[in-house]
Structure formats: structure tokens, C-alpha cells
Amino acid sequence: TTGRGTYVPLVFAPGEAFQFDWSEDWANIGGERAKLQVAHIKLSHSRAFLVRAYPLQTHEMLFEAHWHAFRVFGGVPGRGIYDNMKTAVDRVGRGKQRDVNARFKAMASHYVFEPEFCNPAAGWEKGQVEKNVQDARNRMWQVMPVFADLDELNQWLEDRCIALWAETPHKALPGSIADVWEAEKPTLMALPPAFDGFIEHSKRVS
């Protein structure tokens, strides 16, 4: 932040970070209008992104969204930038202090990335993905999508996202988002098997 309160753009190295956010949108699924929770995951350097739709914002949906994003991106960045969503943060403390949810922490450890949480009401800290929410509405939700089921919708969303990488100039770097992603891909960490959501609870036996 400068003295006059303007925000300096955040610059990210290849493989450094991704940003995550949820939005709500509507689709026609199996002949019925359904309100969906839409996960947006975006690589901060190349700006490659994935959008996936779910019925709820549960841990299971959150974990699946991460797995599919890392699969499509071809690996895992070093850190993830989030707001203080309830599936990730049990309690927001002072400054950057957070009580991180045990299941969320287990997922981050499994994929070996460092979670980082924005200050409350500081959406600019993950401004790329918040812009992505608006762009996705303009590009994919101008007309309500109509699909037989969520699997069909999510396959269409994945294909559309990847097509948009090639169609969209990166702007900060030469070439398209797809061009910059191809250069970023070798810097991502190898993708392990999907996280199963299981965590151990130790109990004392009297």
C-alpha cells in the first residue's frame, strides 16, 4: 500500500502460488434450476484457472476442487491464498493469526503447499481470483448452463477454461495464458494421489 492508500500489484514467480475463492451461480441440472457453489482456482503467475460447480461448500467438495485443479494445472504450487472461509479457518485471530481447521491443514500437508489467509475485508490480496469470478460469470454464465448432471457441467467448465487459456492474452507477459502456463508447469511440485480427507484422532483410553 502506498501513502495515498493505493494498492501495489502483487507479482508472483512461476510455481509460487495459487488463489482460491467460492461464488454462487445458477444452472439447469436435470431439468431443474439449481443454485450452485462454484470453486475458482487460479495460478497466480500464469493466470491459468479452473472453475468447478458443487451443490455445497463442504470439506469434501473443497478437497475435490483442489484435486481437479492440480490435475488440470499439472502440479501443485508452493502456497495457496484464501479468504477466511469456515472450511479452512476455525477462528480468525489478530493480524495473520489463524486457528486452521484440522482437515484443511491435513489436505495442505498432503499436497505440500503452505496455506495463507487474507486479512479480513482485504480482498485485493487475492484480487486475481476475485476478478476471475466476474470474468467467469461474463464468459460462462451469461446464459444459464443446461446439463443432465453436475459431471457433465464440470466437464464442460473444464474444457471451456482450458480453451479460454489459449484465447486470452496474459497482458503482463508476452503470449497467452496457455503460453505462460506451459512455461510455469515445470516449476510446479509433482502431484501426489488425491487426498482422501481422512485424519487420525487420538483418543485416551481409561
Name the predicted role of every residue range.
Residues 2-49, 58-63, 109, 197, ...:
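Mobile-element integrase/transposase regions
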Residues 82-83, 94-95, 113-137, 153, ...:
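RNase H-like two-metal-ion nuclease catalytic core shared by retroviral integrases
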Residues 1-27, 92-94, 99-100, 174-187:
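Basic, flexible linker segments flanking DNA-binding modules
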Residues 52-79:
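Active-site beta-loop-alpha junctions of metal-dependent nucleic acid enzymes
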Residues 96-115:
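Two-metal-ion acidic nuclease core segments, chiefly of the RNase H-like superfamily
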Residues 76-96:
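Acidic/histidine-rich, metal-coordinating catalytic segments
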Residues 133-206:
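Active-site-proximal acidic segments at structured loop/helix or strand boundaries
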